[in-house]
From Swiss-Prot:
GO terms for biological process: translation. This is Small ribosomal subunit protein eS27. The lineage of its organism: Archaea, Thermoproteota, Thermoprotei, Desulfurococcales, Pyrodictiaceae. Part of the 30S ribosomal subunit. Coiled coil: none annotated. Pfam families: Ribosomal_S27e. GO terms for molecular function: structural constituent of ribosome; zinc ion binding. It comes from Hyperthermus butylicus (strain DSM 5456 / JCM 9403 / PLM1-5).
Length: 66
């Protein structure tokens, strides 16, 4: 494991996620630290519940992007 002081350029811990809607099955890209409740573009179901930091994902994470 690399110590904190040897990392010269820190990488962000937030990611974009491809999430599948539990109601209709639509796949949509959302941000892992979303501050606003994201809804499905097809059926309108809520996919993300914002918390203080990392958002609570209400759908199924298909893939982590970037």
């Amino acid at each position: 494991m690399v110590s904190k002081f040897k990392i010269l350029v820190p990488q962000p811990r937030s990611r974009f996620l491809l999430v599948r809607c539990p109601v209709c099955g639509n796949e949509q890209v959302i941000f892992s630290h979303a501050t606003f409740p994201a809804r499905c573009l097809v059926c309108g179901a809520q996919l993300v519940e914002p918390t203080g930091g990392k958002a609570k994902i209400l759908g199924q994470v298909v893939r982590v992007l970037g």
